[in-house]
Each structure stands twice: as structure tokens, then as C-alpha cells.
Amino acid sequence: DLTGDWSSDVCSSDLYKIRKDSESFRELSLLHPASQNEIVSFYKEFQYKIINLCGLSDFSIRSPKKIASKYYKKNNMQWVNEYKSDKMIDVTNEMKYKHLTSYFSYHGYRRLYNFFDSYEFMRLERKFSVFWSLDVSRCFDSIYTESINWSNQEKDFSKSNSDVKNTFGSVFNRLMKTSNHNDSSGILIGPEVSRIFAEIIFQKIDRDIKKILQADKLESGEHYEIRRYVDDIYVFSRSDHEALKVYEAVDKSLKKYKLSLNKSKTAKVRRPFVTKKTQVMLEIKSRLKNLEEKLLEKTESDNKLSPKRLMNKHHIIISFANEIKSLCLDDASSYTMACNFLIKALTNISIKFCKRNYKRNFEKKSLSLFSDFFIVIVDLLFHLFTVNPSHSGSVQLCKMTTAVAEFCDKVIPAEAPLIKSQIFSRCLDFFKSSEFSKISHQYSDDTLLETLNMLIVSSCLGDDYMLSTKDLNSIFEINSERTLSYFEIIVLLYYIKDNPTYSVIRSRVISSIHDTLSDMSDIKSSTIKAYLFFEATTCPYLDEQDKVILVKRALESTGLASHLTIGYDALQVTHDLEGVRYCSSWDKAAMMSLLEKKELHAVY
């Protein structure tokens, strides 16, 4: 049974890259399906142990709190939540949403910036005059998997009882190792299970820190307080002397677990607790509020948003973009932060606008006001993304484009061609931009998800707004002899579907599938082969003949069928797989839900 037991002694994870900033990227990992199955079993067996171990420290501001509910109630805001980012379940909202994305519900702050905007942070500033920010150096890459045993029992006991195989620590240790090439040095970056693993270890480190400081006559809540968001540690104290004591205790406790502080990233602030980035964000929020007031008129009586008459759209766009640049002139990283924040904020404004006006009737003379509003939003969004491409930004553009395209088609169809053409034109501008060229040359061996997601953005506009075969070939170098990557294959199949215009490209995509899956003897350990096999055999745009060939090859490689019945078995399994939904979603609505869940999966 190809969808059944895929257990393997050692699985390889597959790395993919997302853009971190203008000069670097972040590597994330895909878990093999076999590892995912083992994690599900592990959660079921040790779910309450995990919750207990993640609730021992009062330093943590984000950790699993309880098991997420399997049920949901109807949510009247479902239309908004199809696009609005909730992603991770909190204890207070888990019953609101149809699609839960985590086994656990979480307490604390969803995003780190929520903590800095909180009343709790204000209270800590009133109480303490010194604030230090500490960073753990290469945290996930440095975590030693065996240290999970040290975090919930004594280190010496763990080492002297290494033959104990079924304890929580030994099972978790083995699970993390086998999912990562049997490597005990470092854990995968990306999956939720890695963050839970790290949280359990840091909960013990938190307690060690508190004990060291108690021995030094320093009490949490009186002399200092610590707040920790995964591996970001924030120290509040009455003086620099006490802050230094806390720093030393943190450093000492980390070293027990083969971790260390990145001294160059330690930031020290006295009241008021305002950094340059905080100042920039406050100014950006003010500028954003002014922009929204220029564009929209709120009607309190019926909760509607109406577009205002804009005398000079280009002036508004240029003026706002220049204001943001000038605020970030002295700090390039602030500009990255600003772009990411504004892309999400402007997307939310556009979705809110669509939601509030979805069932309204409009006079013909007012339709141009809607076009002007959308053109300003679209131009600003694509400008911010093009100068600073990011994975999260590309997902926001997908959400915006889907919402706006649907709104235009249903509510203001006469204006739809103008607005959709504007979005399509800006997609082309991105693919011709210097930033896209830089990404393509900088990471020539990897097609980054930012660029692939932009292809999905253009597909949201409908069949009348498709890239030409020439453009597709140019953007993704499809005509070359190289084998396309897993993500390229999936996105291109989603984009071209069964459109005969792209028959040559489809042939190259199918050829790449067969090249990658020519040898499936290691499919039970190779993440990329396992993913591609299931995606290809469940894709509605592949011919049955190609699917049968792949299934037959898999059955032969895994020894799951007799050579006497291999032909019949392959056909039967192919038909069975047609009803299976794997990771990718082949229709637009399901793809948007998938993109939403994969928005860097906001576990923390």
C-alpha cells in the first residue's frame, strides 16, 4: 500500500530557500511523509507530556497550551478569514475557524511584534529601567538532539541509561535524528515539531537560569524579568549590573546545552525602550493611516468603505513611496521590515474594502473611483514587493489578487479589465526587474518560492491574463536541458493545467518528473521523490499513462507487487490515488487555502 506504512530507519529532509533580505536567504526543510507519520504517532502518544514540558517556565511568551479541538463552529467572518491570516491556533480562537493548522493550540503572542505592542511590555518598561535583547547563535543548527533527554531528566542519568529506548526523550531524540539524515547535530528549520523540540529544551534552560540567579540573590519579578520568544531572549532589569548578571546566567545555562549567545547581536537600551526600528514603525503606521484616509471614506452608520475621488493617483503613489524610503534612509534592514509590514497592511485594506462592498449596488458614474482605489493599492503593493521580494509578501499578493479579481468580476465587471490588466502588467514588471535578475543569478541552482508564487499571482487573474510561452521559457529557463525542481514542476503544472498552448512546456515538465523518478529505490527515504510521486500521481493534468508508469516503477522499487500482477496492480493503485489529495491543491480556492497555511506556517 503506497499510502500506508512508509516507515524508514533514516529519512532525508529536502531543503528549499526563501529570501531573508537583499543579500541572504533562509534554508527551510520539508519533512519526508514517513517522518510526518511518525510525528503524528508521537504527538498522539506523548501529547500531554509535551504540553506539560512546555508549561514549566514563565519566561516563554509562545508555547503549546493544549490539544487543538477537532471541531469548529460556523464563523460569520469566514469570507474574510479565507484571505486573512490566522494560520496558527490560539487557545482563544481555535473554535472559530474551519481549517486547523496545528495539532496544538498556543498561548502567548503570535508574532514577536505583538509583544512589543502589548500592555505587558509597557508594564515592564514602567517597572524596569534597563532592557537587553539577546540572540542565540545559530540556534536550530546548533541544538544537539540528545539534549532533549537532558531537558526532562538529569544529564548524567541520560548518558548512563542510553539503552532506554522508549522514554519520551529517547523517542523524540530518535525522531529528530532520523528525519535529518540520522544527524544529531542540529534540527530541521521550518517544521512545527522542531519548534516544539526547541521549546522543551529552552523551558529547562529557563529554569536553570532562574536557579543560578536565585543563588546570586536575584529573584524573577523583583530584580529582573525575562521574556523569551523561541530563541530570542529579552531581559528587563533595574540596573546594568543586574542585567549583566542575568546575561552571564543565560550564557552559562546555554553552554550546558552546547548553545551560545551571539554577542554581536546583544542590544542594550535604557528607558524609554525605543529602538530605531520602533521609531520607524511608528512613523510608518502614521503614514499608512494618512494614506487610508486619503483613499477611503468610512460610513459609520452602515459600516461601509467608499473610495474617495483622487485628483492625482500617481502623486499619491510616488509621495507615499518616497515617504517610506526617507524614513528608512539610515537603515536598510528597516526598509525590509517596512516593506513586509506595508505589503500585509495594504493587502488587508484591499480585502476589507472588498468585503465591505461585496453586496452593494453602485451608480455607473462612481465606478471609476473603485478603479482609482485599486490602481493605487496595486501599484504600491507591487512596488514594495519588487524592491524587496519576500515569500510572505508573495503570499499576500496572491491573497490580494484573488480577492480583488473576484470582487471586480462580481461587483464592478465593467472595470475588471482595467484593474486586472494593471495587476498583470505589474507581474511582468517584476519578472523584468533587476531584483528578479539578481535572485535568478544569485541562486541559480534554486528557484526561490518568491518567484514561483508570482506565477500563481498572475494565474489568479484568469485565462485572459496568461504569460506567453516565450515569457515562461525565459523566466524559468524551461528550454534548457536541466531537470526542473520539485517546486517548479508543481507550480508550472498548476499554471499551465491542460491548456494546449503550453504543450511543449508540459512535455518538459513531464520529462523532468520522469527524470527525477527514474529510480525510486530510495523513495521511502528521499523526501523529494516521495513528494513528487504523490503530487504527480494525483495531479488531474497528467495523462493516466504517465501515472501508471510512475506507479508501476514505485511498486517494483518497493517490492509491493508481484511481477505477475504488476500491470493490474499499477492500474488499480493509479485509480485509487485519483481520489487522494496530497499537499498541492489543483484548483484556485484550494490553492489559496494552501498558500495561507504555508505562509511560513506561523507556529511562532
Regions found by a protein language model. Give the residues of each.
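Single conserved hydrophobic/aromatic residue that forms the stacking wall/gate
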Residues: D1-W6, V10
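Nucleic acid-processing catalytic cores of prokaryotic defense/repair systems
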Residues: S8, R19-E23
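Active-site-proximal segment of RNA-dependent polymerases
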Residues: L28-F131
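Short amphipathic C-terminal alpha-helix that caps PH/PH-like domains
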Residues: I39, Y43, I148, Y247-D251
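Short aromatic/hydrophobic-glycine micro-motifs
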Residues: Y48, Q214-L218, L259
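Internal, charge-rich low-complexity segments
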Residues: Y48-Y72, K155-V164, M281-R287, E292-L295
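Conserved polymerase palm-domain catalytic core
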Residues: R123-V230, V235-L244, E297-L532, A536-Y604
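Polymerase palm active-site segment centered on the conserved acidic dipeptide of motif C
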Residues: D240-S319
